[in-house]
Amino acid sequence: MKKAYWIAKYKKINSQEALTKYAEKAKKIIESFGGKALVRGGKYITFEGDDFIRTVIWEFENINVATECHESKDYQEAWSLAKNTTKRDLMIIEGI
């Protein structure tokens, strides 16, 4: 199977504290599904399209595992810590 990439592009963060709490819990959950962090913030340049304030990319063994992680009760509970104070685009993309 092809690897999959979980890409989160953050548009708005109203509470850094809430996002930090989410990130601490989510990191452990995602890693328990075999997720490997490739990008967690850092410098960036936007050449085209909408600008984002933060981008996070995780690599998974395949799209099924990435989806299972996202839909898990534990991950959804972690996301509930930040979802009311954070606006983001989130997608899972299969690699080549």
Residue ranges and their predicted role:
Residues 1-54, 61-67, 71, 94-96:
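Short S/T/G/P-rich N-terminal loop/turn motif that feeds into the first structured element of a domain
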Residues 66-91:
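C-terminal structural segments of small proteins and small subunits
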